């Protein structure tokens, strides 16, 4: 079951993959915020807004039946997602020095 406020990677029925934060979910629809698509490039995978024309401050609702797979996103990708969606760069884990 999807949990509110967690970031997930979704595979949709058209084979696209998006990363988004879950706002709410039920048997018919899932509401997400800041959906980003994973786009393979020669330099590696890039995150691009999943809906270029959407108001980024608005949530997006998708039909739950169109989600074929989902998993909690790994920590490295979450850091990139947070940077792409908010501009905040998370510091690497480790002992503080200086």
Regions found by a protein language model. Name each.
Residues 1-98:
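Conserved RNA-binding domains used in RNP assembly and mRNA/RNA metabolism
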């Amino acid at each position: 079951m999807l949990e509110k406020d967690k970031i997930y990677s979704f595979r949709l029925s058209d084979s696209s993959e998006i990363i988004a934060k879950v706002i709410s979910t039920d048997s018919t629809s899932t509401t997400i915020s800041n959906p980003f698509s994973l786009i393979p490039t020669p330099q590696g995978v890039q995150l691009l807004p999943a809906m270029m024309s959407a108001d980024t401050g608005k949530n997006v609702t998708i039909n739950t039946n169109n989600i074929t797979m989902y998993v909690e996103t790994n920590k490295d990708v979450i850091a990139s997602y947070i940077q792409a969606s908010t501009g905040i760069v998370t510091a690497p884990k480790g002992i503080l020095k200086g």
